[in-house]
C-alpha cells in the first residue's frame, strides 16, 4: 500500500509578504523591463546569497498605471525595499521606484494600496 506524500504544515512553511510599488520614469516601461530590473536590483544590492534568501518573485505589473507587485520572504522585506530604492536607471532611462505598501496577501494589498490605480 502506498503512503501519502508528506507535506509541510502551515506553521513550517515560508511566510511571504507582497510589496506594491509604482515606477516613476521618463517614459512608460514594459513588464519585461521591470521584471529584469527588479531581479538585477536584487542581485546588485543583496548579492546571490541575499537574493536566494529573500526569494524575490515578480507577480504582476500594470503598464497603464505603472504599478506592480513583488513577493518576498517575510524576513527580507526591508532589504528588497532598499534594493528597489537603489534602482535609478532602466535601459538608459531615469527611474524612481516608489514603494506603496506591504501586505501579507495580494487581495489586501490591492484593496489597500492599489485600488486608487484601478486594480481590482
Swiss-Prot record:
The keyword rRNA-binding does not apply. It is an enzyme of class 3 (hydrolase). It catalyses: Endonucleolytic cleavage of RNA, removing 5'-extranucleotides from tRNA precursor. GO terms for cellular component: cytoplasm; ribonuclease P complex. Gene3D superfamilies: Ribonuclease P, Pop5 subunit. Its EC number is 3.1.26.5. It comes from the Archaea. Transmembrane segments: none annotated. The keyword Lyase does not apply. It is found in: Cytoplasm. GO terms for biological process: tRNA 5'-leader removal. This is Ribonuclease P protein component 2. It comes from Thermococcus kodakarensis (strain ATCC BAA-918 / JCM 12380 / KOD1). The lineage of its organism: Archaea, Methanobacteriati, Methanobacteriota, Thermococci, Thermococcales. The gene is rnp2.
